[in-house]
Structure formats: C-alpha cells, structure tokens
From Swiss-Prot:
GO molecular function term, any single one: iron ion binding
Name of the protein described by the UniProt record: Probable Fe(2+)-trafficking protein
Record keywords, A-Z: Iron
Family of the protein in this entry: Belongs to the Fe(2+)-trafficking protein family.
Domain of life of the organism encoding this protein: Bacteria
Biological role stated in the UniProt entry: Could be a mediator in iron transactions between iron acquisition and iron-requiring processes, such as synthesis and/or repair of Fe-S clusters in biosynthetic enzymes.
GO cellular component: cytosol
GO terms classed as biological process: cellular response to oxidative stress
UniProt-listed InterPro entries: Fe_traffick_prot_YggX, Fe_traffick_prot_YggX_sf
Length: 90
C-alpha cells in the first residue's frame, strides 16, 4: 500500500517518499510533509539552479543558498528561478 502525505507544496493528499531524502530532522520533515511529486519537481528545479547559477556543491555558501531555496519551494514562498528559462509547453 502506498504511503500518502498531506503535501506542503501542493496542499493535497499525495503519495509520499519511500524514505527520508536526508539524514536527521530535516530529512524526516521532508519525508512527513512533502510528496514524491513535489520532491521530483524540486530535484528538477534544483538541477536548473545549480547549472544556471553555477553553484558548487562543495561550497558551503552555495549549499546553504540551495537549502534556503528548497525551503521556499516547498512552503509556497517566492523562490529563485533560472534566469531566462522558459518551461516547455505541455
């Protein structure tokens, strides 16, 4: 049976992640409140940010920036977008 969560991003009951994506309290919070769909959407957006803004994941400031953007993304706040990116038409 698929585990569901009340997704913080989409504000609806959706299938959850299979396991916490991070260790510790942050990973448990994501596991409990973020759907698999929202997590997959974040991973795509995160990749755009890393590439377009040339973030270095070995740099603590870049990791902190990305963590902040992830929090904004899931909470519904305004979050950074890749400059000039136009999503494909569906």
């Amino acid at each position: 049976m698929t585990r569901t969560v009340m997704c913080r991003k989409y504000q609806e009951e959706l299938p959850g992640l299979e396991r916490p994506p991070y260790p510790g309290a942050k990973g448990q919070d994501i596991f409990d409140h973020v759907s698999a769909k929202a997590w997959a959407d974040w991973q795509k957006h995160q990749t755009l940010l890393i590439n377009e803004k040339r973030l270095n994941m070995m740099n603590a400031d870049d990791r902190k920036y990305l963590q902040g953007e992830m929090d904004k993304f899931f909470s519904g706040e305004e979050y950074a977008k890749a400059d000039g990116y136009v999503p494909p038409a569906e």
